[in-house]
Amino acid sequence: MTEKIVIGVDVGGTFTDILAFEEETGRVSVAKTPSTKEDQSKGFLEGILKATNDLSLVSTIIHGTTVATNALLERKGAKTGIITTRGFRDVLEMRRRDRPKTWGLWGTFTPVVERKNRLEVSERTLADGSIRVSINEKEIESCAKTLLENGCSAVCLFFINGYANPENEKRAAKVLRSIWPNKHVSIATEILPEIREFERCSTAALNAYLQPPVANYLERLETRISQEKKKSEILIVQSNGGVMSVETAKSLPIRTALSGPAAGVVAARQIAKAAGFENIITGDMGGTSFDISLIANNQNMLTSQANIDFGMTIRTPMIEMTTIGAGGGSIAHIDSTGLLEIGPESAGSDPGPACYGLGNDRPTVTDANLVLGRIDARNPIGGKQKSLDYDAATQAVDNHIAKKLNLSIHDAAEAIIKVANAKMSGAIRLISIERGY
């Protein structure tokens, strides 16, 4: 029998969703399984085996991943070093003279690369591309050895004005790659060969920061699939909505910073086009976040630069979207001013909402919906639970919200939903009405 199934996999913070499309018959099947945060490749394969029990028929797997997104937001990337031009080790800290709190007297920011691991060498390329000072290969070797001794598993090479003439970076890269024990070497001019030193340094440094976790994840993924005695082509969704090979994703993980949400926007555009709608707003509400994007005249809104978090500037083409912490697993709480707030902390899939009965006693948006009867406790989706614990959800809403605000349990649950809806509608206004659409 010929290979004929194309698999789409979206790994989110709470659930992993799978769609299997049989090209010959047009038959579509879907599956949902809890994400395995400790190793996303485990939930990935479990989900595929739910959608189809014969991997020998799978020809292509298209994967939207949040590994890079989570590593950036949770600051769980690899220990990284930077080798740069003398005098420019603090480019990541100086940024563009912005501050975490615009109206505060002071603010703190810690770059993903520690200062002790940002090393300088004597080299200089001028703005016109002429080389004033050539590199000293021994100096590059010494810096590499120092970074390895400091425990760095990835390195970024960034020379000032490298975009005008990459010769010094190319020579230094050759030396660096001959010494570095793995492939986790990011060269700034290879990743972003254009003017603006902060954006180039930030993008290249974050690429290096992501290389080990993303590469390790993709290698585990390939291993798990090969263990099923099947060699399927795996394509990774990029932040701009396109796809790339696994090898490209390993070397340029920065392009996957918004991989999962971007895939959803592209799908929504195609569905809207087929239905005859050219202007739409997409909303992707998962367990952890709510992602929205605007599509005008059947075209995705693209941006060349985005901040994943303060100081984490990425300059690479990506679909423009806004993300807020208002997913099904977002935790409701009373803030320091006595007001009801939703997120950004999420219960995820483990322990999950209080109604999962796995140890979380704080109310989530899902718990509020269950209390209000909007979710059938006997038929939950996702396959993790045969039923949901209505009493646990009720108790969580009562203990953490209702009693503190002197409300009935029903009114407290209604308030949680209203706050979540207000946050979502505010984000929708931000990308549409406030931009003139």
For the regions a protein language model found, what residue spans apply to each?
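N-terminally biased helix-coil "hinge/interface" segments that flank
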Residues: 1-437
